[in-house]
């Protein structure tokens, strides 16, 4: 009984919780860039990993409209967005992965600046892309 209880407590302590709608809204509001973008080019690199694959995505997109922009982006600007998607057989519970964008697709994107300053990164995990 004690062993079962200890195992249960250990299992519960390692669960990744999904993020709440309030937390998603807060992250969207705090994103440095809230832009409507059109994917002009989508480059994908797939790497096999244990239990699945890692998909590195580089998107070159044109800014269609600006909700807000700390960098001063304006319609017509070209931005680069870099992100990864883990496509694994048994994903842990959590915020979920972003979806792969398609060339020509227009979406509202919540983004932050990457540390290399060469591209933007997702600000809200799997909730960074929304219908415009």
Regions found by a protein language model. Name each.
Residues 11, 15-132:
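Transition segments tied to proteolytic processing and entry into folded domains
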């Amino acid at each position: 009984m004690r062993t079962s209880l200890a195992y249960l407590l250990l299992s519960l302590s390692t669960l990744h919780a999904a993020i709440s709608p309030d937390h998603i809204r807060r992250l969207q509001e705090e994103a440095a860039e809230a832009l409507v973008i059109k994917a002009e080019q989508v480059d994908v690199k797939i790497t096999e990993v244990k239990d699945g694959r890692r998909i590195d995505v580089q998107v070159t997109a044109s800014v269609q409209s600006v909700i807000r922009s700390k960098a001063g982006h304006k319609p017509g600007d070209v931005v680069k967005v870099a992100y990864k998607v883990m496509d694994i057989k048994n994903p842990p519970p959590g915020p979920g992965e972003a979806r792969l964008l398609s060339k020509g697709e227009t979406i509202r994107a919540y983004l932050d600046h990457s540390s290399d300053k060469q591209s933007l990164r997702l600000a809200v995990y799997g909730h960074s892309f929304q219908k415009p």
